[in-house]
Amino acid sequence: MSDIALTVSILALVAVVGLFIGNVKFRGIGLGIGGVLFGGIIVGHFVSQAGMTLSSDMLHVIQEFGLILFVYTIGIQVGPGFFASLRVSGLRLNLFAVLIVIIGGLVTAILHKLFDIPLPVVLGIFSGAVTNTPALGAGQQILRDLGTPMEMVDQMGMSYAMAYPFGICGILFTMWMLRVIFRVNVETEAQQHESSRTNGGALIKTINIRVENLNLHDLAIKDVPILNGDKIICSRLKREETLKVPSPDTIIQLGDLLHLVGQPADLHNAQLVIGQEVDTSLSTKGTDLRVERVVVTNENVLGKRIRDLHFKERYDVVISRLNRAGVELVASGDISLQFGDILNLVGRPSAIDAVANVLGNAQQKLQQVQMLPVFIGIGLGVLLGSIPVFVPRFPAALKLGLAGGPLIMALILGRIGSIGKLYWFMPPSANLALRELGIVLFLSVVGLKSGGDFVNTLVNGEGLSWIGYGALITAVPLITVGILARILAKMNYLTMCGMLAGSMTDPPALAFANNLHPTSGAAALSYATVYPLVMFLRIITPQLLAVLFWSIG
């Protein structure tokens, strides 16, 4: 059998063994995709014992391409919500998550200096302790750029594997410990979170208001300042028994009922200006109007602003809200449409059908993947990651590398959405498949390279010490920030658990947090809020640590 055929066969075996290990769960908790790393270590140990020779060049290419696939698909997935997560609504959560990353870096630096841990080893421990595989790839690349011998670079994968198991268990232990320390009642926390979502926050809500302000009588909607901006949409107007779709030129009268869509704070301001909220239903049921959700799939409208499509003037249809990548937005006229946007339309059936034809609304297109944008994005990402940035007194130029470059490019392209007829939307199933394929390839190679010396290092070497160092890097930041978030910020416990899981980019921890109260979405919401920024920082941090440690000796 040729070296290439043998290498492919061994990688397939690693994937099978690793995925089987990852699916084994104890009390609902398992290694997940991380099991592939240990599958690689097991197979790698026996490959080494048998004296088999694998194609090192092929392994290197597969490892790097797997990493690129993984980080690129992550960027495309979170890109639409990445920049939104940095705004005020998620600022506090992101600040605490960033603090966890910073403290983790400080603990790593202290351990490196106190115990004189070799640079590749300490970077591997750091990456494993925070269960972040792209950090491992980024660290290995910067070490190669710094001229580190390959046998030392491979040690990073071994120390990563030593620290990884407690990285998963440590965050679960932290959640449990914080629950005990603060005597948390999970049911109460879930109710408080739901109450806060109802009474405030950046959620999109709807209310029905009666026009009671005499100054508004016989004014056009466009002449009412609170209704003339982009913060509130008036999607229905009821006068006596007639329900209609209003336009900016529609004249309002005292006693009219308006159905408004917007954020709670803006709707409250509308009540102060227009009148009180009423319980009267403005449902389209039994009328000649209907509400329908339509998906944007027509390439001809991508990038166009809602106001430039003139749906109200041409079809007497109002867009009441927009859902983009799971985030509800007010359908501001200045919003540019992206592939996969879901619009709430209000109007007559025939008019809605006409607008749906303009927008596309072809559900089957949502399952198709445009491969051209995928490879354009990957190519641009690799180019971006290869651009050197020279810093005085640093021993090597800084680069985003094969982990950071594709990630940042994917975040940007995911945020842009489309350029002409090229769109970077990827169906969730396709995104997940490519992401899982990438991480399986990467971890398989890392495990294979580490397997030959893993057992000897664990039994006769410093493996146990590495596990201890990893436990400190995992636990100290999580416990410190968890206590600060609860005491100083009075953070909801379920929200805090999601934030802690997101700060470690750890899906098993999110699953554990979700199971604390299965019907509450608090943990998942905070996890998604901090995940994009933290993933970026986790990839950059080992590179900064490597250059810093190298430069100071």
From Swiss-Prot:
InterPro entries: AAE_transporter (IPR050144), RCK_C (IPR006037), RCK_C_sf (IPR036721), Transpt_YidE_put (IPR023018), YidE_YbjL (IPR006512). One of its GO terms (cellular component) is plasma membrane. The chain crosses the membrane at residues 4-24, 28-48, 65-85, 95-115, 158-178, 371-391, 394-414, 439-459, 464-484, 533-553. GO terms for molecular function: monoatomic cation transmembrane transporter activity. Its main location: membrane. It is a multi-pass membrane protein. The keyword Metal-binding does not apply. It is found in: Cell membrane. One of its GO terms (biological process) is potassium ion transport. Belongs to the AAE transporter (TC 2.A.81) family. YidE subfamily. This is Putative transport protein YidE. The gene is yidE.
